[in-house]
Amino acid sequence: MDIYMQYYDFIIDSLSKNPSYVCTRTARQMSVATDSVAYYHYLVLLAKAYMFKSEMDSAKLSMDRAEVFCDGAEPSSLINDLYAEIYNMRGNVCVRQGLTDSSVVCFQKAFDYRLKGSNRDMLHDISINLADAFVRTGHYDKGAMWYRKALSYCDSLKIPEEKRFPVYYGLAQVYMELRDFTSCDHYYELAARQYDKMLPFEKHIYLNNRGNSYYFRADYPNALEFFRKSLLLARSYPDMIFEEHLTEMNLGETFLLMNQVDSAAYYLNLCSDFFRSIENQTALYYLDTQLIELALKQNNLSLARKRMSEAIQPDYVEPNMQHIRNRYLQHYFEEVGDFKQAYYYQMENQRIDDSTPVSYTHLRAHET
């Protein structure tokens, strides 16, 4: 395992910058590995590289092989460490595919296995992943609680300040969801101090989410500024395909809200095929929402109706995305003169808005 850990420390910064290189080097390491546990750690690392290349089927196959090994092995702290890596990776793949509830289950299992393992140095990372997942499910109080736990682990593990920025931009996301933009900006500023030390995918998270924070306060010029930086970053790395198309979708909606219909159509068209190819349900729900509104702004009611009938409906939808869909459906029914249905979607959004103070109260209770 010592050889694997040395290799991991050497290669980890290349994971998001050049996952193809990581695949090649890791396969070479696997061919000479003599320790079976280390071999399957290499395999999980290979799965991470496949995920960054958006090759989800290959990532799943690698994780399945590693889990079969664990299931047949004698229980031990080393096997628990490997289980933790597998379930953390499964959670990350679920996030990429928009399977929000499943990601919570996987990250919780990863955390539980890590507690029973021999390497607790990654507890803060898994805590951050679990916090992110709870925020996506709308459980902002639980998300904030896990971010605070991550900070506590950072303290006990003596993680330096320059490596704590994922917690800060995570907390910023919580406050963005609650529309407390003063606290949101405070935590984004803390994260921004370490921007030069972030890996490319971390820079993308910061830029994209900070752009979203301006989107939600209807400051579209500032949102565009951050989304454009995010797109430029993603296009600088050939394997950041997911990040590139996610940013294109955000640009598309921002232009839509600015009534720049041609630019909106251009960016939404760029990202459509990719998200359909990986079957990311959350992204497709979001994309379908934008395409409905785009048809309305193009004065094409029949196309809007067609897109509504074909739009996917995931088992779970994040409150923000439901709010956006409801707003555009209200617009559609106003256009066709069905004011009863338009009023229904207006009231649904009022219900979502009314739930935010309750979430904020729960969050404050956890902080005190």
Describe each model-derived feature in a short phrase.
Residues D13-S14, S36, D57-S58, R65, ...:
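Coil residues (strongly favoring Ser/Thr
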Residues A27-S31, E67-P75, K109-Y113, K149-S156, ...:
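Amphipathic alpha-helical segments of tetratricopeptide repeats
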Residues M1-D2, T34-H41, E74-E85, G117-D125, ...:
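Alpha-solenoid helical repeat architecture
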Residues D57, D101, S302-R305, S309-E367:
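Hydrophobic positions within repeat-based interaction scaffolds
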